[in-house]
């Protein structure tokens, strides 16, 4: 076997010595506001950043991504990859236990991937990220192999993701999957205490955590969907961290001496995608007119107040496959009106924009887009939905308007994760696009381990999407947090996870 590591990875397989658990003076509670309640805390069910802010403190994966975006040993101390790229061998971290006392070993890793790739995983949103894996094999108690059906150049990165977080076999077999979803157990720095759906979830410090005991004694998550309510609770002391901060209230938080605003550039991108199967947006000329009609720079400046960057494709500058030379379709209202007429549309043509109802900032963006479209000749309307309904029904079942909001986290920092899941025929997040040429390009890059060749194909994919007007890329949005200054040692990561292992309170 040989070690393979490219791009962000080092030239050899990573390894690390076991970390000693250092006793900490656990004291204090931090209360965090999450916009949504994931409903299930099972890693294979999730797809939301709100889950990650909780789950990343309960569970660990074989690989960990640090805040500088490097991939490091987690529950795996080291790994090697076979010459054909189809066998990944992991040496596991010894003397690790799940929070219920169950030992972590190769059997737990095999159980985790058997679940992920089996019937349980097929019901959730994570399985499609790991379909290159055929099965897991136990070599010995502290060694496990992942056997692939085909090569996957992004697999190591994916193994730092939510779906690959390791779960306890005996606990799940004894309690059942439904119980596990609401009473999660992992190997992470905090352990489950209590969960009241739609209200709150409480975690306590795991004093036996392999990476060192947390400094806090408790984490409380409150589910608050309204951004203005989160900010009001932050000001009153009801919460310590607001994860949903509307741009319009940033100055309000900054004016409070006890609060800080943290704005982080990460992988999150925002767009309006098109229903390309039916309605007026089936016509590429209409889609072109819509894109030409919207002044994205004005939206970034006036609504986002600079907390975003322009994009020409649905990926940030941090993404592998990003093409700095790809140009956006320019803002040109005159051309938009001409294309509107050329497409045979009449003034007052209705067009519906589906959005997530509790996203106050994007609602303002959508209202601005509607204003631009009205100038061209459309009669736009906004159709808001509750977040969980939007993600589990509106998009995957094709119940959107002609345009629909898409927020994408880009958690692998690789355009494959975005492009394959959003544009390949039959994918959960792709209710409309069926394009054989696009499918072929998406499949081709997944079979290539060569860094430069794969990057070229990913850039071709981005250009193809742009040339065919398949979406309206809006911006790469910063993640904005409001944080009480009494919270110390909290360094929010670019991947939007919040890890509280090193946090403390005054």
Feature roles, as predicted:
Residues 31, 105-112, 141-147, 188-189, ...:
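Alpha-helical secondary-structure segments
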Residues 32, 197, 341-410, 425-426, ...:
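Ligand/substrate-recognition segments at binding pockets and active sites
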Residues 33-83, 114, 185, 482:
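N-terminal lobe/hinge region of extracytoplasmic solute-binding protein
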Residues 91, 128-170, 194:
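Surface-exposed binding/hinge segments that line
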Residues 178, 206-252, 379:
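Ligand-site clamp/hinge motif
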Residues 285, 381-390, 417-485, 506:
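Extracytoplasmic/peripheral linker and loop segments enriched in polar/acidic and small residues
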Residues 309-342, 359-364:
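Structural transition elements
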